[in-house]
Amino acid sequence: MKKTLTVNLNNIVFHIDDDAYELLQNYLSAVEKQLSEDERKEVMSDIEARVAELFTERLQRNKNVVNKEDVEQIIEILGKPSQFGGDEAET
């Protein structure tokens, strides 16, 4: 039996395993640290909206809880935290 939490992303409620929540929280914190103060709020809102969209796609039919594997796959889709932020002139 696993402990689950309820989270709200982009005004959508999800049930998520405790270990999946910890992984997601660490990922979002790492991404946030890569962003400048000016872009942080908007970009984090966009990322949370995309995570919510991906969670919704994964939670079809009889699956009701986001697990660690779901979060790992979403992180793979979104990219590493180091890929966010930085000086756009360098790209």
Question: Can you say where each PLM-predicted feature lies in the sequence?
Answer:
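Soluble N-terminal domains of membrane-associated systems
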Residues: 1-91
